[in-house]
C-alpha cells in the first residue's frame, strides 16, 4: 500500500497506513467476501443524528475487517481508489467521491500495553496528542 500524494504526516493513531494494509491483505485472500456496500450505508449517516455507530457482534464475525475496510476507504494516508474500484463500492459514484478524503483515527486496543487502566488511557491520549500536534502544530493541546 502506498502513501497518498501530498500527505506528509502519518502517525501512530492518526492517518496510519494500518487499516489500508490490513484490508488490502484481506481483499487479496482466497475466501474474501465483498462487503463494501456497508461503506455506502455508513456514508449516508455522516452529518445525521445516526452518525455514531456501535457494531456489536460475536467474536470472529468480521468487526475488525469492517473497521479496516472503512478506515482504508476513508483515510487520506493511503491511495486505495484502485483497490476499491474493483469492488461493489466502486460502482457507487457518490460513495467514491469520499474515498481517501478524511483524517482517520485508528486504534488497535490490543496493541497498547499497560499495567493498569489509567496508564492504558494515558498511553492512548499521549499517542493521539503527539499525532495531532504533528499534523496540526499551530493548535494548542
Report the location of each language-model feature.
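Phosphate-binding site recognition
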Residues: 2-141
Amino acid at each position: 500500500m502506498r502513501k497518498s500524494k501530498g500527505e506528509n504526516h502519518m502517525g501512530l493513531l492518526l492517518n496510519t497506513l494500518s487499516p489500508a494494509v490490513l484490508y488490502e491483505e484481506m481483499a487479496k485472500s482466497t475466501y474474501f467476501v465483498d462487503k463494501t456496500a456497508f461503506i455506502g450505508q455508513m456514508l449516508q449517516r455522516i452529518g445525521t443524528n445516526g452518525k455514531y455507530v456501535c457494531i456489536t457482534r460475536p467474536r470472529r464475525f468480521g468487526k475488525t475487517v469492517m473497521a479496516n475496510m472503512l478506515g482504508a476507504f476513508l483515510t487520506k494516508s493511503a491511495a486505495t481508489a484502485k483497490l476499491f474500484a474493483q469492488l461493489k463500492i466502486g460502482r457507487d459514484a457518490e460513495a467514491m467521491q469520499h474515498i481517501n478524503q478524511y483524517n482517520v483515527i485508528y486504534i488497535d486496543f490490543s496493541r497498547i500495553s499497560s499495567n493498569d487502566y489509567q496508564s492504558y488511557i494515558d498511553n492512548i491520549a499521549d499517542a493521539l496528542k503527539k499525532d495531532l500536534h504533528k499534523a496540526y502544530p499551530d493548535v494548542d493541546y
